[in-house]
Curated annotation (Swiss-Prot):
Source species of the chain: Janthinobacterium sp. (strain Marseille) (Minibacterium massiliensis)
Cofactor names: Mg(2+)
Pfam families, sorted: MMR_HSR1 (PF01926)
Residues that bind GTP: 31-38, 58-62, 92-95, 159-162, 193-200
GO BP terms, alphabetized: division septum assembly
Keywords: Cell cycle, Cell division, GTP-binding, Magnesium, Metal-binding, Nucleotide-binding, Septation
Protein origin, superkingdom: Bacteria
Location of the EngB-type G domain: 23-219
Residue positions binding Mg(2+): 38, 60
GO molecular function: GTP binding; metal ion binding
InterPro entries: G_ENGB_dom (IPR030393), GTP-bd (IPR006073), GTP-bd_ribosome_bio_YsxC (IPR019987), P-loop_NTPase (IPR027417)
One cellular-component annotation, GO: cytosol
Name of the protein in question: Probable GTP-binding protein EngB
Amino acid sequence: MSLLWQARFFTTVNHLRDLPKTQVPEIAFAGRSNAGKSTAINILCNQKKLAFASKTPGRTQHINYFSIGGAHVGQHRKDETKVDEIRALLVDLPGYGYAEVSGSAKLHWQELLGDYVQRREQLAALVLIVDSRRPFTELDIQMLEWFAPTGKPIHCLLTKSDKLNRNDAANALRTARTILGSYVDENGQPFPFTAQMFSALKRSGLDEANDKIIELLGLNEAPQEESNGPAANDV
C-alpha cells in the first residue's frame, strides 16, 4: 500500500500568514484549471473525494493541505503536539488560468501562488499538472519561472494521456522534456525537472508518479520503529 493512501484533510488557508507551522516536507500540486489536478491527487491517494474537483474553473480558491501519517486529522489542528506525528504534507494549490472569476480574485491567487512557491521553506518539490493535449501555456511557463530559482525539483504530470495516440504521446513528452530541460542554473546545469505521461482514467503512469512523489518527499524508507526488514524493492 502506498504511503499516499494515508492522506487525510489537514487544513485550508487563504493567506500566507495562515500556513501551518509544521516542519515536515511538503510537495505542492499546481496546474491550469481543469488540467486534471484534483483528479490526479485523488487517484494517487486512492480516494474519490480527497481533493475537490470542480467543473467550474477557479472554484478551488484556497490552498488545501493533506497530511500523511499521524493521528486523526481533527486532533492535529487542536493539539499541536500531534503535529510531530505527521511525516509529510500534500498541498493542493488553486488552479490558474480561469476566466470566470473577478480580476481582484485572480490577482490575489496569483500573488498567493507566487509567494508560496518561492518562499515556503518546507516546500520540497512541485508537481506540475499539464494537459498532455495542449502545449505549456503562458501561465505554466510563469509557474516554472517562479519556481526555478529555488533550485528545487519539479515533476510534470502530462495528464489525460489516454486521449492521445502513441505518436502524439511521445511528441508531447519530448516537448515537455525539452521545455523543462531549457531551464539551467547560473553554472549552466539543468534544474532537476522531470516529466511523465499520466492518465487517471486508465491508471497509467500511476506507479511511476507515486514512486517519484515518495522519493521527492524523502519517504523512501519507513521510520526505524516500523521497519521489519528490507523493502520489496531491495530484494
